[in-house]
Structures are given as structure tokens and as C-alpha cells.
Amino acid sequence: MDNIKLQKLTESISESDFGLSFKHTAYFNPRLRTTGGRYLLGSHDIEINPKQFEKFGETALIDIIKHELCHYHLHIQRKGYKHKDADFKKLSQKVGAPRFCAAIENYEERANYIYKCLGCGETFKRIRKVNTRKMVCGKCKGKLHLHKHIK
């Protein structure tokens, strides 16, 4: 899917589910890493993470668009557009927009280091490097050592 198809999909979802038109731009932003999408308050544009579409398909993309359109329409109407606001919760429930999207990578896939306890042999996956002089095994309080550097 390209940005033109994404724009048309966003406009059609806005018309069908919200009964309001989407007058700004929706586009894929490959720099997004930890979020499915975001609504930009200044320009009123919607950015979508292309990795969400690649991994989870069009149904996940539609859910993300609905979520971001909730922010968009409430902000345009000068109502509560933040996640904590009652207006946002009410509208997102009405249109079936989820509060969160699925994570692109789980913790095990993101892990860069594997540590092993010298006492009990337990292994620990970590994204960031750990100071083995300070950190100990949570199970037996044994000494940790870097077993494997994955990436």
C-alpha cells in the first residue's frame, strides 16, 4: 500500500465510521518505531507506521486509522482528544477503535544480550548491557556473566 491508497482509506473510514470528512493528509512514516501511528496537533496530519501494515495487515491498519481519527476529529471539534479524556474514550468505543496496537517486536526478539547465572544456570535476555559487577541473579543471587552477544 502506498500513501495515496492510505489517504483514500483514511478518508473513507472517516466518512463511514465518523460521518465527518478528513481534510488533511495521512501518510506512512518509516521513522516511527514504537508506535502504530500518531496525530500531529500542529498540521492535523496522521502518520502511520508502515511496519504495522507489513506485519499485521489491513485490519490492524484500519484499527490504527480509527484510533488516530478519534484524536483528529475531537481536536478539530475542540473536545478532549487525549487518551485520558472522557470524550476520547466515548468516541473510540463508539467507532470500535482500540486503545493500543500490537507490538511489532516482542522483548525476546529485541534482546541483544543473553546473561547466564554462574550459580543456578538461569539465562536472562536483555536489550541493554548490564553491569555484571552490580547486578546479580534474581533467583539465587549468583554472579552473572555475558553468555552471548546477539546483535
UniProtKB/Swiss-Prot annotation:
GO terms for biological process: response to stress. Residues 7-147 form the SprT-like domain. Keywords: Cytoplasm, Metal-binding, Zinc. Zn(2+) binds at residues 67, 71. Its cofactor is Zn(2+). GO terms for cellular component: cytoplasm. It is found in: Cytoplasm. Binds 1 zinc ion. InterPro entries: SprT-like_domain, SprT_Zn_ribbon, Uncharacterised_SprT-like. GO terms for molecular function: zinc ion binding. The active site is at residue 68. It holds the Pfam family Zn_ribbon_SprT. Belongs to the SprT family. This is Protein SprT-like.
